[in-house]
Amino acid sequence: VVGRNEGCPDEWMREKKTIREHLDYKFIMALEGNDVASNLKWVMSSNSLAVMTRPTCETWFMEGTLVAGYHYVEVKEDFSDLPETKAQNLLRELYEYYIEHPEQAEDIIRHAHEYVRQFQDKERENLISLMVLDKYFRLSGQQ
């Protein structure tokens, strides 16, 4: 848990890290809380592997089109895909697997970068924004 302690054991508490500090890690968890995993966009733009559950929230980033094992490393929401349920063991197993198979890790990172690239075209994003506004005004009778 990062930030304020809301009844969690003290050993779970950590000081908040900056994005720059996170980028020192090979694996970064991108977990949904009450909404999307807000760090997913910058994690997928980094050279770290995004580790996450299958996304359930959808935004302009089209999280529902992401493919597990291709754009990110998937874990089950309750970690039941592992013999032991502690997150430490999950991370250890993932770490060992992708350290032993760096080409697979690099492929996932490359695919994540390719996915993010589609949102980095300013002209295209501006055109899409105008098209959304046009459709909104037409459907709401304001055109």
Give each language-model segment a name.
Residues 1-16, 61:
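Catalytic donor nucleotide-activated moiety binding site of glycosyltransferases and closely related
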Residues 16-143:
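Catalytic binding pocket for nucleotide-activated donors in carbohydrate/polymer assembly enzymes
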